[in-house]
């Protein structure tokens, strides 16, 4: 039999298959990419066993667990674990701390003729490892921020770099008031775990300098890890510039045409277009206080007219009206103020091609220094 695993580095670098014995409610709060949840107990069973443990102690709780997961139910779950083990002979199982639940499942599998190793320390140990991974990267690596006005194409530039930490990608959110996607954001712990694994894999490839977008602490509903965010308040900044008309077209592409297509892909044609329109109206409503009554009313009317025309004919051209107004009257003044406050940290400014080449050259220089 393969030994139980203590090499968390290899687990995440090699995307080793793992099955999670925790209850669904635990799994939903936070897990690891690609892991399959095959719980020993469902949420209700876990709650009953937990209550019994508090009131009567461990022995009674274990007895209740065996009583609840017995007969056909036990056989059904055992078959699912066995199927995973046979499909992934190089994998592992784990529970919260690598304790009783892991041991029970290992024992039942052994009775069925399958010896399958566990992750020592379970979920908690792997989670701690990833938190440490993020903090070590913050302390040991070089970081540079990419900033710029809304619509300059920061994401487009980032996608052309090998050393990017895509906060918005990991958060499944574009970071602005209109940044929600057609699919849900990850749980906070999933966001943090995904970010840490991304850093771990890139560092294993020899990357010691990371580029990330100049974001606030909150990206939609996801919070940037504190150590990283504190560093972002002092990291050097590269500023991306582009013509106003180009920015309008890029926003039209990303936040209207492509986002509507996302909703249609997820929800179907009719519901997708309707839900897209509702999302856009809600996004505008979310900044009502910051816009002020008169400006909100005017831009909302332009948005409403554009959505009506888009839903009627598919023509998105009217969206340029509210996009231009929102940039000139809201986003650009806000970003101009922020740029002024960070002016001393800006080490380069240019268009998309210039910024991309500068960042690539910067990474090459850092790599030579590390060597």
Swiss-Prot record:
Q: Transferase among the record's keywords? A: yes
The biological process GO terms on file are: tRNA wobble uridine modification
**CDD domains, sorted:** RHOD_YbbB
The entry's keywords: Selenium, Transferase
NCBIfam families, per the entry: PRK11784.1-2, PRK11784.1-3, tRNA_sel_U_synt
EC identifiers of the protein: 2.9.1.3
The record lists the catalysed reaction(s) as: 5-methylaminomethyl-2-thiouridine(34) in tRNA + selenophosphate + (2E)-geranyl diphosphate + H2O + H(+) = 5-methylaminomethyl-2-selenouridine(34) in tRNA + (2E)-thiogeraniol + phosphate + diphosphate; 5-methylaminomethyl-2-thiouridine(34) in tRNA + (2E)-geranyl diphosphate = 5-methylaminomethyl-S-(2E)-geranyl-thiouridine(34) in tRNA + diphosphate; 5-methylaminomethyl-S-(2E)-geranyl-thiouridine(34) in tRNA + selenophosphate + H(+) = 5-methylaminomethyl-2-(Se-phospho)selenouridine(34) in tRNA + (2E)-thiogeraniol; 5-methylaminomethyl-2-(Se-phospho)selenouridine(34) in tRNA + H2O = 5-methylaminomethyl-2-selenouridine(34) in tRNA + phosphate
Name the residues annotated as catalytic in the UniProt entry. Answer: 95 (s-selanylcysteine intermediate)
Tell me the GO molecular function terms: transferase activity, transferring alkyl or aryl (other than methyl) groups; tRNA 2-selenouridine synthase activity
Q: Which InterPro entries match?
A: Rhodanese-like_dom (IPR001763), Rhodanese-like_dom_sf (IPR036873), SelU (IPR017582)
Q: Which gene encodes it?
A: selU
Q: Does the keyword Transferase apply?
A: yes
Q: Which organism is it from?
A: Pseudomonas entomophila (strain L48)
Q: Which residues form the Rhodanese domain?
A: 12-135
What is the stated purpose of this protein? Involved in the post-transcriptional modification of the uridine at the wobble position (U34) of tRNA(Lys), tRNA(Glu) and tRNA(Gln). Catalyzes the conversion of 2-thiouridine (S2U-RNA) to 2-selenouridine (Se2U-RNA). Acts in a two-step process involving geranylation of 2-thiouridine (S2U) to S-geranyl-2-thiouridine (geS2U) and subsequent selenation of the latter derivative to 2-selenouridine (Se2U) in the tRNA chain.
> Which EC class heads this enzyme's classification?
transferase
What family does the Swiss-Prot or TrEMBL record give for this protein?
Belongs to the SelU family.
**Which N-terminal residues, if any, form the signal peptide?**
none
Q: What is the name of this protein?
A: tRNA 2-selenouridine synthase
Q: How does it assemble?
A: Monomer.
The record's section on SUPFAM superfamilies has: Rhodanese/Cell cycle control phosphatase
């Amino acid at each position: 039999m393969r030994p139980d695993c203590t090499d968390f580095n290899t687990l995440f670098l090699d995307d080793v298959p793992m099955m999670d014995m925790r209850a669904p409610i635990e799994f939903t709060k936070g897990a690891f990419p690609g892991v399959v949840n095959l719980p020993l107990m469902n949420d209700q069973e876990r709650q009953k066993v937990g209550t019994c443990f508090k009131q009567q102690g461990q022995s009674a709780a274990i007895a209740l667990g065996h009583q609840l997961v017995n007969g056909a139910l036990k056989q059904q779950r055992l078959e699912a674990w066995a199927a995973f083990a046979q499909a992934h002979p190089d994998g592992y199982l784990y529970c919260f701390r690598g304790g009783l639940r892991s041991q029970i499942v290992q024992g039942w599998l052994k009775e069925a003729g399958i010896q399958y190793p566990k992750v020592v320390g379970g979920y908690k140990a792997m989670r701690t490892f990833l938190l440490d991974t993020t903090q070590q990267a913050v302390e040991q690596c070089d970081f540079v921020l990419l900033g710029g006005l809304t619509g300059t194409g920061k994401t487009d530039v980032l996608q052309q770099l090998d050393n990017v930490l895509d906060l918005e990608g990991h958060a499944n959110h574009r970071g602005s008031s209109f940044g929600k996607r057609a699919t849900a954001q990850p749980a906070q712990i999933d966001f943090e775990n995904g970010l840490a694994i991304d850093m771990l894999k890139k560092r294993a490839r020899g990357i010691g300098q990371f580029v990330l977008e100049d974001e606030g602490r909150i990206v939609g509903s996801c919070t940037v890890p504190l150590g990283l965010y504190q560093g972002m308040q002092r990291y050097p900044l590269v500023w991306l510039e582009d013509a106003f008309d180009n920015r309008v077209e890029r926003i039209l592409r990303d936040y209207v045409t492509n986002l509507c297509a996302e909703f249609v892909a997820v929800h179907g044609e009719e519901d997708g277009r309707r839900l897209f329109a509702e999302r856009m109206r809600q996004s505008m409503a979310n900044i009502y206080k910051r816009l002020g009554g008169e400006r909100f009313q005017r831009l909302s009317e332009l948005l409403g007219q554009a959505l009506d025309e888009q839903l009627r004919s598919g023509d998105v051209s009217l969206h340029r009206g509210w996009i231009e107004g929102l940039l000139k009257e809201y986003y650009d003044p806000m970003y101009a103020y922020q740029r002024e406050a960070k002016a001393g940290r800006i080490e380069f400014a240019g268009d998309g091609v210039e910024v991309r080449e500068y960042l690539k050259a910067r990474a090459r220089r850092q790599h030579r220094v590390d060597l």
